[in-house]
């Protein structure tokens, strides 16, 4: 099949281009630093720092390669899927909840049901709310709002609720329980998070694509972050809206038929999922043993191992989620992901997995240990003067004239420029692409896109050392055997006082003060280089508190604020109506599963 051969060629070429960019950047950084460090004689610390720079820069280069590939491609709808084709397959939309606000969650379901009602296919879709809530007060509110949801949407027999008595296996176990007991009634299942929202036409189109490709086991969409209000949340939301589609296109080109599963806003073929995705309970205690935490990537790998296509279609629109509004909530969520990704080291060599899936596991691990390489480089640079050999101005015997070390400062400057280029250029190039293609209009125009992009670069530079500190602590906690558990997601405005921010980050202040103090004492020449890292850490409580406040600036405007889609408007209206309702009274237990 020419089309299949072409697809494989594109996938292979994309991977080779990305690898070439990553390796070229890494090799250049390695040799530049090696030459810079050898001006006073090469020592073990110079070699150590060069290796740390090599690993760290290769990771930056790999990320930049996603943007490069994405900039040279465009979203493409699968040729075998007509946008108007009828559908005939019954599909269940799964909404797992765990101690969530039922008003916010159930109003999203009401909005999606209303959006589906605007299509001819609503009766083919059912919703199943799968509660693992442990808080009895929240469970009572879930029952109240479920009954209101049924009544307002006239949804008896289309929207279901069940609450497990024992939440074995967390979210993955919750879905597995439904698949085992009720999955046979539905060929397809859309998996959402509690904060997910999807257009009715998007849900229909996902079913079309599944029907058009019988070997398609899982189809992942790119969720767009919406409804952020705080400065931190809006910055992340803008970056995701502007940059993520381009990075996602690059990712889709590389992954081919062994794509990702991000755990939500995706559709699965129930038979494939049931036959292939039974997750083992890993031997030993958490954090490396027990239930698989980041189950989504493992399930994608198991589907691919069984011969199913796992695809990421970056052209699908109308898929939404909400994100953390402050740095602390982001770090809490990231702590869970860190443990799950490091746990993948136990699965890396499982038999039969595709090579690309193993590489994806490695990428996930590297995403969290990368800060350790940068931290190691900083510490090695502080310690380097103690390992440097004494300067020898007369290295040639009997030569009467001194030989001075060559000045290699330009190489250090070139290295710094190259590293910052890998960090900054992809985002600047994406902003230019948005202006050239007209995409910038949705963000308020070319001028606002450029200003917002520059502001986001400054903002991300300030918070990067704080995020690095949180990630480093998370990795160390996991390596020391500390289980992060299954914390409830915090949703809402996320505003934090300075006292709350201090409680969450005082240890970062301590790290920053110790780091800059040690640098001043042992290697004072490095102080100017480390100030951009140390100052945000020292002032982290203030940074966290200020960025958690509601933003009233026109910066970081994104298209869904300029032109909200029907399902977003419907959700806003339903949520506002429900929030005006009086608090529910006690509601009798209902539809509880004792699995």
UniProtKB/Swiss-Prot annotation:
It comes from the Bacteria. The keyword Glycosyltransferase applies. It is a multi-pass membrane protein. The chain crosses the membrane at residues 13-35, 50-72, 365-387, 414-436, 449-471, 526-548. It is found in: Cell inner membrane. The keyword RNA-binding does not apply. Keywords: Cell inner membrane, Cell membrane, Glycosyltransferase, Membrane, Transferase, Transmembrane, Transmembrane helix. Its EC number is 2.4.1.-. Its main location: membrane. GO terms for biological process: biosynthetic process. It holds the Pfam family Glyco_trans_2_3. GO terms for molecular function: hexosyltransferase activity. Pathway: Glycan metabolism; osmoregulated periplasmic glucan (OPG) biosynthesis. GO terms for cellular component: plasma membrane. Involved in the biosynthesis of osmoregulated periplasmic glucans (OPGs). Belongs to the glycosyltransferase 2 family. OpgH subfamily. This is Glucans biosynthesis glucosyltransferase H. It comes from Cereibacter sphaeroides (strain ATCC 17023 / DSM 158 / JCM 6121 / CCUG 31486 / LMG 2827 / NBRC 12203 / NCIMB 8253 / ATH 2.4.1.). The lineage of its organism: Bacteria, Pseudomonadati, Pseudomonadota, Alphaproteobacteria, Rhodobacterales.
């Amino acid at each position: 099949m020419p089309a299949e051969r072409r697809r494989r060629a594109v996938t292979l070429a994309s991977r080779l281009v990305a690898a070439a960019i990553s390796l070229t950047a890494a090799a250049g950084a390695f040799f530049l630093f090696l030459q810079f460090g050898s001006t006073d004689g090469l020592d073990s610390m110079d070699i150590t720092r060069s290796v740390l720079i090599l690993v760290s820069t290769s990771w930056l280069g790999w990320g930049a390669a996603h943007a490069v590939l994405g900039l040279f491609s465009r979203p493409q709808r699968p040729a075998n899927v007509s946008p108007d084709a009828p559908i005939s397959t019954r599909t269940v939309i799964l909404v797992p909840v765990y101690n969530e606000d039922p008003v916010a969650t159930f109003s999203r379901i009401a909005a999606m049901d209303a959006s589906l009602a605007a299509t001819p296919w609503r009766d083919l879709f059912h919703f199943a709310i799968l509660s693992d809530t442990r808080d009895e007060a929240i469970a009572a509110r879930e029952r109240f709002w479920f009954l209101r949801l049924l009544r307002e949407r006239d949804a008896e027999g289309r929207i279901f609720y069940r609450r497990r008595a024992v939440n074995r296996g967390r979210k993955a176990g919750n879905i597995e329980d439904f698949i085992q007991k009720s999955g046979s009634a539905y060929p397809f299942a859309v998996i959402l998070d509690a904060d997910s929202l999807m257009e009715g036409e998007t849900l229909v189109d996902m079913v079309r694509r599944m029907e058009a490709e019988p070997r398609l086991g899982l189809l992942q969409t790119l969720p767009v972050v919406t409804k952020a209000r705080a400065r931190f949340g809006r910055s992340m939301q803008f970056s995701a809206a502007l940059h993520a589609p381009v990075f996602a296109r690059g990712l889709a080109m590389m992954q081919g038929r062994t794509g990702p599963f991000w755990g939500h806003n995706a559709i699965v073929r129930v038979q494939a999922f049931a036959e292939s995705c039974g997750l083992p309970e890993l031997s030993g205690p958490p954090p490396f043993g027990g239930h698989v935490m980041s189950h989504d990537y493992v399930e994608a790998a198991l589907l691919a191992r069984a011969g199913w296509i796992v695809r990421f279609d970056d052209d699908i629109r109308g898929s939404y989620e909400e994100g953390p509004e402050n740095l602390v909530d982001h770090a809490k969520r990231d702590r869970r992901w860190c443990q799950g990704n490091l746990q993948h080291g136990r699965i890396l060599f499982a038999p039969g997995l595709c090579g690309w899936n193993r590489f994806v596991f490695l990428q996930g691990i590297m995403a969290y240990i990368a800060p350790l390489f940068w931290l190691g480089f900083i510490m090695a640079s502080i310690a380097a003067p103690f390992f440097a050999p004494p300067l020898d101005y007369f290295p040639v015997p009997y030569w009467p004239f001194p030989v001075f070390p060559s000045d290699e400062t330009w190489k250090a400057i070139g290295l710094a420029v190259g590293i910052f280029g890998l960090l900054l250029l992809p985002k600047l190039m994406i902003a230019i692409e948005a202006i050239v293609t007209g995409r910038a209009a949705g963000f308020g125009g070319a001028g606002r896109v450029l200003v917002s992009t520059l502001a986001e670069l400054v903002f991300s530079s300030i918070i990067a050392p704080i995020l690095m500190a949180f990630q480093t602590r998370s990795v160390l906690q996991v390596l020391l055997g500390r289980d992060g558990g299954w914390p409830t997601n915090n949703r809402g405005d996320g505003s934090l006082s300075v006292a709350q921010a201090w409680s969450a980050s005082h240890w970062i202040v301590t790290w920053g003060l110790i780091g800059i103090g040690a640098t001043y004492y042992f290697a004072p020449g490095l102080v100017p280089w480390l100030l951009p890292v140390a100052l945000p850490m020292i002032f982290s409580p203030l940074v966290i508190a200020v960025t958690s406040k509601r933003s009233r600036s026109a910066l970081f405007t994104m298209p869904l604020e300029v032109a909200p889609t029907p399902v977003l408007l419907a959700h806003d209206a339903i949520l506002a109506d429900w929030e005006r309702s009086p608090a529910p009274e006690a509601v009798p237990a209902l539809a509880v599963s004792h699995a």
